[in-house]
Amino acid sequence: MNVTLVEINIKPERVDEFLEVFRANHEGALREPGNLRFDVLQDPEVKTRFFIYEAYKDDEAVLAHKKTPHYLACVEKLEEMMSQPRQKRSFIGLLPQV
Protein backbone atom coordinates (compact mmCIF):
# COMPACT_ATOMS: atom_id res chain seq x y z
CA MET A 1 0.00 0.00 0.00
CA ASN A 2 1.31 3.43 -0.98
CA VAL A 3 0.42 6.20 1.50
CA THR A 4 1.09 9.91 1.06
CA LEU A 5 0.57 12.66 3.61
CA VAL A 6 0.40 16.10 2.01
CA GLU A 7 0.48 19.36 3.96
CA ILE A 8 -1.24 22.27 2.22
CA ASN A 9 -1.23 25.79 3.66
CA ILE A 10 -3.88 28.08 2.21
CA LYS A 11 -4.16 31.86 2.20
CA PRO A 12 -6.82 32.81 4.81
CA GLU A 13 -9.11 34.48 2.30
CA ARG A 14 -9.05 31.39 0.03
CA VAL A 15 -10.04 28.63 2.50
CA ASP A 16 -13.66 28.34 1.31
CA GLU A 17 -12.53 28.26 -2.32
CA PHE A 18 -9.91 25.61 -1.47
CA LEU A 19 -12.56 23.38 0.10
CA GLU A 20 -14.79 23.71 -2.95
CA VAL A 21 -11.96 22.95 -5.39
CA PHE A 22 -10.54 20.12 -3.32
CA ARG A 23 -13.94 18.48 -2.85
CA ALA A 24 -14.00 17.64 -6.57
CA ASN A 25 -10.55 16.01 -6.31
CA HIS A 26 -11.62 14.11 -3.19
CA GLU A 27 -14.81 12.79 -4.76
CA GLY A 28 -13.00 11.82 -7.97
CA ALA A 29 -10.21 10.05 -6.08
CA LEU A 30 -12.72 7.95 -4.12
CA ARG A 31 -14.08 6.61 -7.43
CA GLU A 32 -10.64 5.49 -8.67
CA PRO A 33 -10.23 1.70 -8.65
CA GLY A 34 -6.79 1.84 -6.96
CA ASN A 35 -7.82 4.25 -4.20
CA LEU A 36 -8.14 2.84 -0.69
CA ARG A 37 -8.57 6.07 1.27
CA PHE A 38 -8.54 9.82 0.64
CA ASP A 39 -9.05 11.98 3.74
CA VAL A 40 -9.02 15.78 3.92
CA LEU A 41 -8.06 17.01 7.40
CA GLN A 42 -7.95 20.53 8.86
CA ASP A 43 -5.53 21.51 11.62
CA PRO A 44 -7.65 22.55 14.62
CA GLU A 45 -4.98 25.04 15.73
CA VAL A 46 -4.21 26.58 12.32
CA LYS A 47 -7.41 26.73 10.28
CA THR A 48 -5.51 27.46 7.06
CA ARG A 49 -3.43 24.26 7.31
CA PHE A 50 -4.78 21.07 5.75
CA PHE A 51 -3.45 17.55 5.52
CA ILE A 52 -4.41 15.09 2.82
CA TYR A 53 -4.06 11.41 3.71
CA GLU A 54 -4.05 9.32 0.54
CA ALA A 55 -3.76 5.53 0.37
CA TYR A 56 -3.49 3.68 -2.93
CA LYS A 57 -3.03 -0.02 -3.54
CA ASP A 58 0.29 0.45 -5.38
CA ASP A 59 2.56 2.87 -7.25
CA GLU A 60 0.63 2.35 -10.50
CA ALA A 61 -2.57 3.53 -8.82
CA VAL A 62 -0.78 6.68 -7.60
CA LEU A 63 0.50 7.40 -11.11
CA ALA A 64 -2.99 6.84 -12.53
CA HIS A 65 -4.41 9.30 -9.97
CA LYS A 66 -1.96 11.99 -11.05
CA LYS A 67 -3.25 11.74 -14.64
CA THR A 68 -6.95 12.12 -13.81
CA PRO A 69 -8.87 15.25 -14.85
CA HIS A 70 -9.98 15.95 -11.26
CA TYR A 71 -6.39 15.83 -9.95
CA LEU A 72 -4.97 17.98 -12.77
CA ALA A 73 -7.72 20.61 -12.40
CA CYS A 74 -7.22 20.74 -8.63
CA VAL A 75 -3.44 21.15 -8.82
CA GLU A 76 -3.78 23.92 -11.40
CA LYS A 77 -6.20 25.91 -9.23
CA LEU A 78 -4.40 25.13 -5.99
CA GLU A 79 -1.17 26.95 -6.83
CA GLU A 80 -2.62 30.45 -6.45
CA MET A 81 -4.44 29.57 -3.21
CA MET A 82 -1.41 28.31 -1.30
CA SER A 83 0.60 30.49 1.07
CA GLN A 84 3.64 28.21 0.59
CA PRO A 85 4.53 25.12 -1.48
CA ARG A 86 2.92 21.78 -0.61
CA GLN A 87 4.94 19.37 1.48
CA LYS A 88 4.65 15.64 0.84
CA ARG A 89 5.79 12.57 2.76
CA SER A 90 5.44 9.08 1.40
CA PHE A 91 5.02 5.92 3.45
CA ILE A 92 4.68 2.19 2.95
CA GLY A 93 1.40 1.13 4.50
CA LEU A 94 1.82 -2.09 6.47
CA LEU A 95 -1.47 -2.52 8.33
CA PRO A 96 -4.17 -3.08 7.46
CA GLN A 97 -2.92 -5.37 4.72
CA VAL A 98 -4.72 -4.99 1.41
From Swiss-Prot:
Sample GO molecular function, one term: oxidoreductase activity
Protein's cellular compartments: Cytoplasm
Top-level taxon of the source organism: Bacteria
Coiled coil: none
Major place of residence: cytoplasm
GO CC annotation: cytosol
Alphabetic keyword roster: Cytoplasm, Isomerase
E.C. numbers: 5.3.1.32
Classification via Gene3D superfamilies: 3.30.70.100
SUPFAM superfamilies registered for this protein in UniProt: Dimeric alpha+beta barrel
Catalysed reaction equations from the record: (2S)-2-hydroxy-3,4-dioxopentyl phosphate = 3-hydroxy-2,4-dioxopentyl phosphate
This protein's record includes keyword Isomerase: yes
Keyword Lyase: no
All copies of domain ABM, residue ranges: 2-91
Class of this enzyme: isomerase
Function: Involved in the degradation of phospho-AI-2, thereby terminating induction of the lsr operon and closing the AI-2 signaling cycle. Catalyzes the conversion of (4S)-4-hydroxy-5-phosphonooxypentane-2,3-dione (P-DPD) to 3-hydroxy-5-phosphonooxypentane-2,4-dione (P-HPD).
Annotated family: Belongs to the LsrG family.
Subunit structure: Homodimer.
Protein name: (4S)-4-hydroxy-5-phosphonooxypentane-2,3-dione isomerase
Organism: Klebsiella pneumoniae subsp. pneumoniae (strain ATCC 700721 / MGH 78578)
Gene: lsrG
